[in-house]
Design a protein with these regions (language model features):
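Bacterial N-terminal signal peptides
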Residues: 8-18
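Positively charged n-region of N-terminal signal peptides that target proteins for export
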Residues: 1-5
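Core of compact, soluble alpha-helical bundle domains
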Residues: 23-147
Length: 147
Protein backbone atom coordinates (compact mmCIF):
# COMPACT_ATOMS: atom_id res chain seq x y z
CA UNK A 1 0.00 0.00 0.00
CA UNK A 2 1.41 3.39 -0.95
CA UNK A 3 2.36 5.88 1.74
CA UNK A 4 -0.14 8.40 0.41
CA UNK A 5 -2.93 5.86 0.91
CA UNK A 6 -1.84 5.27 4.46
CA UNK A 7 -1.58 8.97 5.22
CA UNK A 8 -5.07 9.50 3.95
CA UNK A 9 -6.50 6.59 5.88
CA UNK A 10 -4.95 7.96 9.05
CA UNK A 11 -6.73 11.25 8.52
CA UNK A 12 -9.97 9.30 8.63
CA UNK A 13 -9.53 9.13 12.37
CA UNK A 14 -9.97 12.83 12.75
CA UNK A 15 -12.96 13.38 10.60
CA UNK A 16 -15.77 11.10 11.74
CA UNK A 17 -16.13 12.63 15.16
CA UNK A 18 -16.26 16.22 13.93
CA UNK A 19 -17.87 18.47 16.48
CA UNK A 20 -19.23 21.96 16.51
CA UNK A 21 -17.97 23.30 19.83
CA UNK A 22 -16.78 26.87 19.86
CA UNK A 23 -13.56 27.99 21.52
CA UNK A 24 -13.91 29.84 24.79
CA UNK A 25 -13.95 33.63 24.62
CA UNK A 26 -10.42 33.83 26.02
CA UNK A 27 -9.04 31.46 23.38
CA UNK A 28 -10.75 32.95 20.32
CA UNK A 29 -7.75 35.14 19.56
CA UNK A 30 -5.29 32.27 19.51
CA UNK A 31 -5.10 29.90 16.56
CA UNK A 32 -6.07 26.29 17.08
CA UNK A 33 -2.42 25.45 16.40
CA UNK A 34 -1.36 27.58 19.37
CA UNK A 35 -4.14 26.27 21.61
CA UNK A 36 -3.09 22.69 20.79
CA UNK A 37 0.41 23.57 22.00
CA UNK A 38 2.21 24.02 18.68
CA UNK A 39 4.21 21.58 16.64
CA UNK A 40 5.70 19.76 19.63
CA UNK A 41 2.29 18.90 21.05
CA UNK A 42 0.95 17.90 17.63
CA UNK A 43 3.97 15.65 17.14
CA UNK A 44 3.32 13.96 20.49
CA UNK A 45 -0.34 13.33 19.61
CA UNK A 46 0.62 11.91 16.21
CA UNK A 47 3.21 9.63 17.83
CA UNK A 48 0.58 8.23 20.19
CA UNK A 49 -2.03 7.98 17.42
CA UNK A 50 0.26 5.99 15.12
CA UNK A 51 1.12 3.71 18.05
CA UNK A 52 -2.58 3.20 18.75
CA UNK A 53 -3.25 2.33 15.11
CA UNK A 54 -0.29 -0.05 15.04
CA UNK A 55 -1.80 -1.96 17.94
CA UNK A 56 -5.33 -1.97 16.53
CA UNK A 57 -5.93 -5.32 14.81
CA UNK A 58 -9.03 -3.94 13.09
CA UNK A 59 -6.97 -1.59 10.93
CA UNK A 60 -3.24 -2.12 11.38
CA UNK A 61 -3.10 -4.14 8.16
CA UNK A 62 -3.32 -0.88 6.24
CA UNK A 63 0.04 0.11 7.71
CA UNK A 64 2.03 -3.12 7.27
CA UNK A 65 4.66 -1.82 4.86
CA UNK A 66 4.50 1.84 5.80
CA UNK A 67 7.52 3.97 6.57
CA UNK A 68 6.25 5.19 9.93
CA UNK A 69 8.75 8.04 10.14
CA UNK A 70 7.44 9.52 6.89
CA UNK A 71 3.84 8.84 7.88
CA UNK A 72 4.26 10.71 11.14
CA UNK A 73 5.93 13.67 9.41
CA UNK A 74 3.08 13.93 6.89
CA UNK A 75 0.44 13.71 9.61
CA UNK A 76 2.16 16.38 11.70
CA UNK A 77 2.32 18.71 8.71
CA UNK A 78 -1.30 18.06 7.80
CA UNK A 79 -2.58 18.76 11.31
CA UNK A 80 -0.24 21.72 11.73
CA UNK A 81 -1.47 23.34 8.53
CA UNK A 82 -5.15 22.51 9.15
CA UNK A 83 -4.98 24.07 12.62
CA UNK A 84 -3.49 27.36 11.40
CA UNK A 85 0.17 26.59 12.02
CA UNK A 86 3.13 27.41 9.78
CA UNK A 87 3.55 23.92 8.27
CA UNK A 88 2.57 22.88 4.75
CA UNK A 89 1.11 19.50 3.81
CA UNK A 90 2.42 18.57 0.37
CA UNK A 91 0.87 15.13 -0.08
CA UNK A 92 -1.83 14.15 -2.54
CA UNK A 93 -5.47 15.06 -2.03
CA UNK A 94 -7.56 12.72 0.08
CA UNK A 95 -9.69 11.84 -2.95
CA UNK A 96 -6.62 10.83 -4.99
CA UNK A 97 -5.11 8.98 -2.07
CA UNK A 98 -8.18 6.88 -1.28
CA UNK A 99 -9.48 6.16 -4.78
CA UNK A 100 -10.23 2.45 -5.09
CA UNK A 101 -9.31 1.56 -1.51
CA UNK A 102 -12.86 0.69 -0.53
CA UNK A 103 -12.64 2.45 2.83
CA UNK A 104 -15.89 1.96 4.71
CA UNK A 105 -17.28 3.33 7.95
CA UNK A 106 -15.93 0.44 10.05
CA UNK A 107 -12.28 1.26 9.36
CA UNK A 108 -13.07 4.92 9.64
CA UNK A 109 -14.67 4.41 13.04
CA UNK A 110 -11.71 2.43 14.33
CA UNK A 111 -9.36 5.24 13.38
CA UNK A 112 -11.63 7.74 15.10
CA UNK A 113 -11.38 5.74 18.30
CA UNK A 114 -7.59 5.60 18.01
CA UNK A 115 -7.32 9.35 17.40
CA UNK A 116 -9.70 10.32 20.20
CA UNK A 117 -7.72 8.06 22.51
CA UNK A 118 -4.49 9.84 21.51
CA UNK A 119 -6.04 13.27 22.02
CA UNK A 120 -7.40 12.22 25.41
CA UNK A 121 -4.05 10.72 26.42
CA UNK A 122 -2.45 14.12 25.82
CA UNK A 123 -5.28 15.90 27.63
CA UNK A 124 -6.35 17.95 24.62
CA UNK A 125 -9.30 20.08 25.71
CA UNK A 126 -12.78 19.29 24.43
CA UNK A 127 -13.11 22.58 22.53
CA UNK A 128 -9.75 22.09 20.79
CA UNK A 129 -10.45 18.43 20.09
CA UNK A 130 -13.85 19.20 18.58
CA UNK A 131 -12.45 22.10 16.57
CA UNK A 132 -9.62 20.00 15.16
CA UNK A 133 -11.99 17.19 14.22
CA UNK A 134 -14.33 19.77 12.70
CA UNK A 135 -11.57 21.31 10.58
CA UNK A 136 -10.65 17.90 9.20
CA UNK A 137 -14.26 16.69 8.95
CA UNK A 138 -14.97 17.78 5.39
CA UNK A 139 -12.41 15.23 4.16
CA UNK A 140 -14.69 12.32 5.05
CA UNK A 141 -16.57 12.39 1.76
CA UNK A 142 -13.26 12.05 -0.11
CA UNK A 143 -12.14 9.09 1.99
CA UNK A 144 -15.09 6.78 2.69
CA UNK A 145 -16.45 5.08 -0.42
CA UNK A 146 -20.16 4.80 -0.98
CA UNK A 147 -21.47 1.25 -1.26
Amino acid sequence: MKLQHVIGIAVIGWVLAAGSSQASDGAKHQSLYDRLGGKGAITAVVETFVGNVGGDKRINGYFGSTDLTKLKAHLVNQICEASGGPCKYTGRTMKQTHAGMGVQDGAFGALVEDMVSALDHHKVGKAEKDELLGVLGPMKSDIVEKK
